[in-house]
Amino acid sequence: MAKPTVNINQAIRAREVRVVGADSEQLGIMSLQEALALAEARQLDLVEVSPTAVPPVCRIMDYGKFKYQQSKKLQEARKKQSHVQVKEVKLRPKTDEHDLMTKIKHVRRFIEEGNKAKVTLVFRGREITHLEFGSRALDRVAAELEDIAVVEFKPKMEGRSMFMIVAPKVKK
């Protein structure tokens, strides 16, 4: 991903620019030379903030400080992002009651942590002829978790396995 380039000082190619001061005060439209002289008198940089405007908008500011603040904002935004993982729990069509409840507890824990959960039911051998056992088991899991989770992907066959994805309910 290419970083957007910002023109500063002599890199600005417009003849006339709209100048905004360091404190966001409008200084008006002036020639590039006048704007550069004004920025130099204040010992600051002339930074082109809106090159597509007519005339382009330039701000008088300390460019080094501006870059530092932009990088800090970017770091804060990255820090606030939450990474949702998809955890997987595998079942079999003949999984007994207690084992199924244990697997449901695992899925419940994943959902409470804010992650999505993929519940996979693996068919082996001739079990594939009884798909209704698999869909019943996945429906049971969905029913047990309906208080804290919503089914994002309905049960679906993929090869010799049937899966569904459950996600945490969105809090209002």
From Swiss-Prot:
- InterPro entries cross-referenced by the UniProt entry: T_IF-3_C_sf, T_IF-3_N_sf, Translation_initiation_fac3_CS, Translation_initiation_fac_3, Translation_initiation_fac_3_C, Translation_initiation_fac_3_N
PROSITE patterns noted in UniProt: IF3 (PS00938)
Q: Which GO terms describe its biological process?
A: ribosome disassembly
Q: Where in the cell is it found?
A: Cytoplasm
Q: Does the keyword Cytoplasm belong to this entry? A: yes
The highest taxon in the source lineage is Bacteria
Alphabetized Pfam families for the sequence = IF3_C, IF3_N
The alphabetical list of record keywords is:
Cytoplasm, Initiation factor, Protein biosynthesis
One example of the protein's molecular function in GO is:
ribosome binding
State the GO CC annotations: cytosol
User: Could you give the subunit structure recorded for this chain?
Assistant: Monomer.
- Relate the protein's function as given in its record: IF-3 binds to the 30S ribosomal subunit and shifts the equilibrium between 70S ribosomes and their 50S and 30S subunits in favor of the free subunits, thus enhancing the availability of 30S subunits on which protein synthesis initiation begins.
Recorded hits in HAMAP family, A to Z, give: IF_3
Q: What family is this? A: Belongs to the IF-3 family.
Task: Write the protein's name.
Answer: Translation initiation factor IF-3
